[in-house]
Amino acid sequence: MIPSHTAPSPFFPWSHRMNTAPECRTPPLSLARAEVRQLPVYNAGLSEDAVRAKYGIPRITKLGSNENPYGPSPAALEHWTEIASSLFRYPDASAEGLREELSRQTGIDTDRIVIGNGSEQIIRMICEAFLSPGDRLVTVLPSFGLHLIWPQMMGARAEAIPMTADARFDLPQLHQAVTSDPLKVLMFSNPSNPVGCLMTGDAMQSLIDACPADTLIVIDEAYWEYARSSPDYADSLTILKNQSRPWMVLRTFSKAYGLAGLRVGYALTSDPGLTAVMTRVRDPFNSNSAALEMARLSLLDQEHMHKTVGATLAEGKALKAALEERGYFVAQSFANFLFFNARESASALAERLLEQGVIVKPWKEKGYETWIRVSIARPEDSQAFLAALDRVRQPSHSSAA
């Protein structure tokens, strides 16, 4: 662990007195826009250090953030010292090197690629660039939280269509939603986060065709590397590239490439004009130089990525079977996580797991308060989770239903 210091800094001798400043007479929240005052706070999950400090547990099993436990490409890491030696320079604001490699691998021209500080920033940029107060966005429920939060920040109406009872896309309801009122943006993740299910190619094509011609289609493919080997996976780029409508496909280096700590995401767009609009709201140096180069080098090591994805998918099958043996309904997943119905308060169960040193993510959206998302990691992490689960789950759930 990197050491930290709590003593006052000799460079800022007043720093130890800052907590004695008089309280502001104007409530800070009153200064915020109405949309911001009503904005929910995104739950980014707990860190290992926070759990360790609260419960005094030395070993933490972190299964709440869908990280790749196998880490970045070793071949990319060999260049880390070289990368670090130039950190005194500003990064390339155009991210040209990374965009060129992405173009080579995806077939999308560089002027149709946008780089972001994680795909979260890309989602925010989309909302800032294209949503006005009163505009309507349709997504699904449960969903990645920022699909709802960022539209609300812009004063847009975010309408979330619940999944079916068996945790699949409710296609009839989605069709009704995209045709009932004017629609500015359709945004959903595929594979779904947090459920993990896939939308088939025919279903995706039908849903897109049902949208108004000027609706921006945004497909968040943060977990596509885990799904693309499945015969059920529909290549969104193949479906979208022949569409004469605006679209974006979002992807990230945080999951399969193991670069969550560096924050690199990207958007593939239908038109250079969309890229130009996004550039208007993009911070000039929004991605740091280490992140850009590590992402580029990681793309060159597809063998490592495929190896870690394969190990994750194999472990996912074993973990899903183990949860089902314990009587839980587990949604079909094509990602590096599982979504299961705990049949009790997910928050309460997650808290008891924390006391055992295991971090999972309880869902809190209405209608899903008994569901938990657990990341698929190494076999030993799964075993630690299952052992803790067996110790703390309610007696009525101790045998298969």
From Swiss-Prot:
Its cofactor is pyridoxal 5'-phosphate. Pathway: Amino-acid biosynthesis; L-histidine biosynthesis; L-histidine from 5-phospho-alpha-D-ribose 1-diphosphate: step 7/9. GO terms for biological process: L-histidine biosynthetic process. Keywords: Amino-acid biosynthesis, Aminotransferase, Histidine biosynthesis, Pyridoxal phosphate, Transferase. It holds the Pfam family Aminotran_1_2. One of its GO terms (molecular function) is pyridoxal phosphate binding. The modification N6-(pyridoxal phosphate)lysine is found at K255. CDD domains: AAT_like (cd00609). Its EC number is 2.6.1.9. It catalyses: L-histidinol phosphate + 2-oxoglutarate = 3-(imidazol-4-yl)-2-oxopropyl phosphate + L-glutamate. Homodimer. PANTHER family: HISTIDINOL-PHOSPHATE AMINOTRANSFERASE, HISTIDINOL-PHOSPHATE AMINOTRANSFERASE 2. Belongs to the class-II pyridoxal-phosphate-dependent aminotransferase family. Histidinol-phosphate aminotransferase subfamily. This is Histidinol-phosphate aminotransferase 1.
